[in-house]
Amino acid sequence: IDQPSGPDVEMADNFQSATRSAAAGGNTTVLPFAMQEKGQSLRECVESYHKKANGNLFVDTSFHLIISDPSPQVLGQELPALARDGYTSFKVFMTYDDLVLNDEELLKVFEVAKNEKTLVMVHAEGYDAIRFLTKKLEDEGKLAPYYHGLSRPQIVEREATHRAISHAQIVDIPIVIVHVSGEEALSQIKWAKERGIKIFSETCPQYICLTEDDMKGLNMDFEGAKYVCSPPPRDLESQQAIWDGLIDGTFDIFSSDHC
């Protein structure tokens, strides 16, 4: 809701429309994301979102905190203080130029979460592998929406999921792996749960409604862009694996991930 966006991009929801919709659907509390930008104080980030929201809310509202710049001040002062103020869930990214955290940064955020008894959500895709594959596709002129999926195949998600789980083991905290797209990442979550590792997982409608074949023939326009998400839709086998994970309880959360 009301996230920073690029030129000519307008979010479908502002705080007024989103919380009104929530109320109409019977939801009395919402927690959208407050996204820290590089170089920004986390406290300043949270205050700016509250400023946008104030006077435009129809239900109770707080925020999940997206940590993109875990500076010593953020980790040592701001994040612990905000956790004690009641902001008890964070989100971190293992990809995207403006959001990615390296392994040491992930571990440090996890450590704060453990100390403050908060929960961390993880977007698990391998940044360097995606950059490598994207550069190859761009050099070959393969730019259509279909190739987005080829730039971040299942192995990239599988590797990052396993790495996130391993980091959580090192620090000994529970984490949530969000928007799981296919059977390879799902296999890592099952592996962890079978060993008693404290892992939760989420998937979304796009992974049971779409496959990579739906991306074929799309153009470089807004209609094509509507199908682009990360992680991308996978093959039919993965679609079935996601259905099975929902049915057998491997997934703890099923949500729209709508942005």
Model-derived segments and spans:
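Acidic-and-aromatic substrate-binding clefts and catalytic sites of carbohydrate-active enzymes
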Residues: K38-Q40, P70-P72, L99-V100
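Alpha-helix-loop-beta-strand connector modules within alpha/beta enzyme cores
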Residues: L42-D60, H64, L107-V122
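Active-site mouth loops of central-metabolism enzymes
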Residues: I1-D13, A34, D60-L75, M94, ...
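Short, acidic/polar
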Residues: M11-T19, D69-L82, R163-A164
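Histidine/acidic residue-rich metal-binding segments in metalloenzymes
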Residues: Q77-F254
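Short phosphate-coordinating micro-motif centered on Lys-Gly-acidic
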Residues: D257
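Metal-associated gating/positioning segment near the N- to mid-region
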Residues: I1-N56
